[in-house]
């Protein structure tokens, strides 16, 4: 296979196939896992499985395994069949199971030393719409960094929806498909005021939590109203390294989040820091404005509030803030379960400020990125 990583050596025993690639990657594949992933046992059109685990031999034993022309052929002892696996596909599986569930992410803890225009992904709206290679790269960087930007998005009603469609599918909420962020009298949400807002994630009271958020600058304020962003994963990992007990408390304590307005009441409970089954940080949910009274035993109040205060202090630390001014027509997309956002205070009486926003479903952003990756790198999806 052209461009495939060469295999340094391959060996097997009845219960295991082992492959070492030229770059040092070692893949170990259980015989039962290989038997479960035989391509011929899937429908060729949908790719869905045609068999169930109960249809497979309980303990398939490998008779032989041999590499040839970018593939490896595996024969089993008790079955009169063999299966061929693409070595590049097996390499991708080996990388995925390396134990690094955060593989491919770039953390940016001390964001104050970064420059939004220099250190993060930017594309023009027209370029991302017309150049699929550019859009694929932009989406990959969005997943890597948890944030990416577009410029020259038309400042009209349709602009944000046309731009959002380049990343994923818009999630309709009680705010509608889009919402306007500008100051109003007696706001039902402090986002619609002149107040500065500390770093937070949006809608932790919603089920599911919106995966990605989009903000489009229609009228930028020349004085105040600067955007703030911080890498919640990086700060959570910093807390874990420095104060592991506090980190553990925040991962296991359910926090109630509540939103009430004239036309909606939303409630959900989730920890401030959420982990995968393997213990890696998978989401940060932080919005002090929306926390309802906690249901804590008295003995648990001290440890939780101590950990909560310490994490809040991290989020307030300006060393961890990426601060800059969006210009008219700029648009930012960010992971609402990783990248916290906020703003500095401003005076709408002196300088009106108007952003338009929407949310994207997490699975649709993943799908857009995966489809483009598959289009330009088919060898990893064979």
Segments predicted by a language model, with ranges:
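Motif-centric detector for short Cys/His coordination patterns
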Residues: 1-131
């Amino acid at each position: 296979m052209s461009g495939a990583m060469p295999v340094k050596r391959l060996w097997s025993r009845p219960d295991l196939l082992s492959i070492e690639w030229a770059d040092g990657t070692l893949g170990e594949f259980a015989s039962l896992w290989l038997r479960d992933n035989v391509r011929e046992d899937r429908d060729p059109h949908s790719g869905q499985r045609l068999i169930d685990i109960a249809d497979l031999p309980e303990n398939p034993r490998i008779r032989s395994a041999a590499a040839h022309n970018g593939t490896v052929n595996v024969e089993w002892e008790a079955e009169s069949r063999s299966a061929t696996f693409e070595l590049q596909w097996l390499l991708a599986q080996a990388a995925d199971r390396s134990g690094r569930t955060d593989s491919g992410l770039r953390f940016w803890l001390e964001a104050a030393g970064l420059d939004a225009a220099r250190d993060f992904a930017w594309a023009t709206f027209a370029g991302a719409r017309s150049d699929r290679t550019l859009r694929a790269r932009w989406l990959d960087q969005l997943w890597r960094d948890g944030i990416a930007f577009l410029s020259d998005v038309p400042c009209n009603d349709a602009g944000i929806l046309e731009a959002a469609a380049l990343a994923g599918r818009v999630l309709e909420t009680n705010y509608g498909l889009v919402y306007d962020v500008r100051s109003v009298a007696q706001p039902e949400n402090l986002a619609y005021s002149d107040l500065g807002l500390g770093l937070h994630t949006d809608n932790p009271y919603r089920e599911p939590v919106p995966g990605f958020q989009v903000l489009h600058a229609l009228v930028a304020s020349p004085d105040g109203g600067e955007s703030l962003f911080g890498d919640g994963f990086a700060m959570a990992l910093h807390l874990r390294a420095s104060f592991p007990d506090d980190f553990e408390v925040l991962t296991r304590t359910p926090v109630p989040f509540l939103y009430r307005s004239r036309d909606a009441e939303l409630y959900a409970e989730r920890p401030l820091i959420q982990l995968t089954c393997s213990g890696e940080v998978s989401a940060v949910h932080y919005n002090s404005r929306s926390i309802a009274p906690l249901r804590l035993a008295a003995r648990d109040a001290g440890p939780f509030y101590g950990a909560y205060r310490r994490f809040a202090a991290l989020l307030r630390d300006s060393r961890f803030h990426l601060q800059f001014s969006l210009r008219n027509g700029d648009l930012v997309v960010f992971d609402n379960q990783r990248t916290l956002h906020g703003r500095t205070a401003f005076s709408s009486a002196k300088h009106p400020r108007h952003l338009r926003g929407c949310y994207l479903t997490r699975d649709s952003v993943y799908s857009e990125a995966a489809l483009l990756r598959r289009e330009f790198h088919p060898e990893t999806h064979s």
